[in-house]
Amino acid sequence: MNTQATPSPQFYLTAPATCPYLPNQMERKVFTHLVGPRAPEMNDLLTQGGFRRSQNIAYRPACETCRACVSVRILTEQFQPTKSMRRVLAANSDVVATVHAAEPSTEQFALFRRYLDHRHQSGGMSDMSALDYAIMVEDTHVNTRIIEYRVREPGSGIDSSKRGELLAVALSDVMSDGLSMVYSFFNPELEKRSLGTFMIIDHITRTRALGLPHVYLGYWVDGSEKMGYKTRYHPQEHLTPRGWEIYSPKEE
């Protein structure tokens, strides 16, 4: 009987580039392509090993002099929202979340551009076009979903034909042990809603309902103010050289 071996993934190392998170640092990444029938399995294994997905690429930092980027995952079963998080849930009690296939829309892109123009006027994503956005959403060989968050239309009930204002969008991968939040964005003018926090709590709730243990948030960068929000959700684990370990915040 002839058997054809599945080729092992090939890994590559990027050239040094300026770090987008910390001053006076250079970054390098190791990456591989997520394609073919084994892509979902590989995405699971690599994410559990500290990689992140971007389109059909899985990557992780491989910096020569810095180890500030740390993979973070929330333990969904033990998670309890804080008082401020409960206020966020109350402020968004009029929001309805709907799960869709990984397909872009002009409405999503318009919100995406508003978010970038307000929050990320510089950086690698600042000049993304509608085509770039479509590629970001569609170029996936794993189980990826789009979650749209909208204001509930008065009297709409379960009638999905009545759609309220689009407030936020999350691009997420469904994995064997949880959900991985690949990218999310929201209306930056609605600060009082704290939509970023709301989406993370919603993912925790969804993951728990699936009976799965983890929500992956990507990298927390110690010393980067814009990444600080990722350590607010407890309990959570950080990937260390010894494996995944419970994170204990430093005493102020």
Swiss-Prot record:
It is found in: Cytoplasm. It comes from the Bacteria. SUPFAM superfamilies: Acyl-CoA N-acyltransferases (Nat). One of its GO terms (cellular component) is cytoplasm. It catalyses: N-terminal L-glutamyl-[protein] + L-leucyl-tRNA(Leu) = N-terminal L-leucyl-L-glutamyl-[protein] + tRNA(Leu) + H(+); N-terminal L-aspartyl-[protein] + L-leucyl-tRNA(Leu) = N-terminal L-leucyl-L-aspartyl-[protein] + tRNA(Leu) + H(+). Disulfide bonds: none annotated. The keyword Ubl conjugation does not apply. Keywords: Acyltransferase, Cytoplasm, Transferase. Its EC number is 2.3.2.29. It holds the Pfam family ATE_C. One of its GO terms (biological process) is ubiquitin-dependent protein catabolic process via the N-end rule pathway. GO terms for molecular function: arginyl-tRNA--protein transferase activity; leucyl-tRNA--protein transferase activity. It is an enzyme of class 2 (transferase). PANTHER family: ARGININE-TRNA-PROTEIN TRANSFERASE 1, ARGINYL-TRNA--PROTEIN TRANSFERASE 1. Belongs to the R-transferase family. Bpt subfamily. Functions in the N-end rule pathway of protein degradation where it conjugates Leu from its aminoacyl-tRNA to the N-termini of proteins containing an N-terminal aspartate or glutamate. NCBIfam families: PRK01305.1-3 (NF002342), PRK01305.1-4 (NF002343), PRK01305.2-3 (NF002346). This is Aspartate/glutamate leucyltransferase. It comes from Agrobacterium fabrum (strain C58 / ATCC 33970).
